[in-house]
Amino acid sequence: MAYDKQALIDQLGQLTIMELADLIDGLKETWGVTAAVAAGPAAAGPAAAAEEKTEFDVVLVDAGASKINVIKEIRAITGLGLKEAKDMSEKGGVLKEGISKDDAEKIKAQLEGAGAKVELK
């Protein structure tokens, strides 16, 4: 049985909504199907969230009230001179870049023990 697809589309386009609903119900009964929407693929979470970060930067946010102790810790951690460590304690910024999580947490604990506010990024 040959059919003209365009003629069929034109005929369906002339049907009212009620006639289309009856047609759909008739097709469901004849073929034994339901008009369920196919589910798309499940959206995966962001790749960055799935992977654990391996390199961290230790950032000094604030030296706190006991700047002398913080300066001593900065010198011990970075190997900077007294003036550079003092400047770092006043300005803040990145103390260490690209280090492991364990090392970053140790440094953070040292600096917080001295009274500084530190972030890991």
Swiss-Prot record:
Annotated signal peptide: none
Family matches, as Gene3D superfamilies: 3.30.1390.10, Single helix bin
Classification via InterPro entries: Ribosomal_bL12 (IPR000206), Ribosomal_bL12_C (IPR013823), Ribosomal_bL12_C/ClpS-like (IPR014719), Ribosomal_bL12_oligo (IPR008932), Ribosomal_bL12_oligo_N_sf (IPR036235)
The entry's keywords: Ribonucleoprotein, Ribosomal protein
Gene Ontology cellular component list: cytosolic large ribosomal subunit
SUPFAM superfamilies (alphabetical): ClpS-like, Ribosomal protein L7/12, oligomerisation (N-terminal) domain
Assembly with partners or alone: Homodimer. Part of the ribosomal stalk of the 50S ribosomal subunit. Forms a multimeric L10(L12)X complex, where L10 forms an elongated spine to which 2 to 4 L12 dimers bind in a sequential fashion. Binds GTP-bound translation factors.
Family designation: Belongs to the bacterial ribosomal protein bL12 family.
Protein name per UniProt: Large ribosomal subunit protein bL12
Organism: Deinococcus deserti (strain DSM 17065 / CIP 109153 / LMG 22923 / VCD115)
Name of the coding gene: rplL
